[in-house]
Regions:
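Domain-scale signature associated with acetyltransferase and cell-envelope carbohydrate enzymes
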Residues: 1-102, 123-125, 132-134, 142, ...
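Short, acidic/turn-prone active-site loops that include or flank metal/cofactor-
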Residues: 105-107
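Short, glycine/charged-rich beta-strand-loop motifs at protein surfaces that mediate ligand recognition
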Residues: 111-112, 133
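Glycine-rich NAD(P)-binding loop of Rossmann-like domains
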Residues: 112-123
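Conserved coupling/switch loop of ABC ATPases
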Residues: 136, 154
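A generic "structured core" feature
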Residues: 143-151
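Conserved active-site beta-strand element of glycosyltransferases/polysaccharide synthases
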Residues: 162
Length: 171
């Protein structure tokens, strides 16, 4: 099974290199499967060595977006990272299932910028629990832990534990 996954990863990398050229940089070995990469001509993607995933993994880098994922990161099933500005993920990070990282909004008003966005920075050795969403403009410091189900809308200091408590009844 491990050999099969490695062979699949090599073919995936070769296809990406033929399709996107030097705008995609990939470290080896890479143990990724079921990955969808959508990248516009002006966008760049850098993947560090020994990145692993389990199950569906979507990487979207649009416009002039820049996506960088450090070495030795692990992404569980159903990960979606969509980048129109910049997303930087450090080394040795772990991500739970059903993760969404998005560095822009969809502005439904007429403000001139269709997808206003801001850089997302995730430090080294960060652990993000299942069902989390990380929104534009957020900086998560090294060794931080994000509790399951959190929506991260503001900066998280290094070494801290963040949990987004949303138990209020709205109606």
């Amino acid at each position: 099974m491990l050999v099969h996954k490695a062979v699949k990863s090599v073919f995936t990398v070769l296809i990406w290199k033929m399709k996107y050229g030097s705008s995609v940089k990939i470290g080896f070995p890479l143990a990724m499967e079921k990955v969808t990469l959508e990248k516009d001509r002006g966008a760049t993607v850098v993947l560090g060595e020994k990145i692993q995933n389990r199950g569906a993994f979507y990487l979207g880098c649009k416009g002039q977006g820049r996506l960088s994922i450090g070495a030795h990161c692990f992404f569980n099933t159903n990960t979606s990272i969509t980048c129109m500005k910049e997303v930087v993920i450090g080394d040795y990070c772990k991500f739970g299932t059903n993760l969404v990282i998005v560095d822009h909004d969809h502005d439904f008003r007429e403000t001139g910028e269709e997808f206003p966005g801001e850089k997302i920075e995730i430090g080294d050795h960060v652990w993000v629990g299942a069902g989390c969403t990380i929104l534009k403009g957020v900086k998560i410091g090294d060794h931080a832990v994000i509790g399951a189900g959190s929506v991260v809308r503001r900066d998280v200091p290094a070494g801290s534990v963040y949990y987004d408590k949303r138990e209020a009844v709205i109606l």
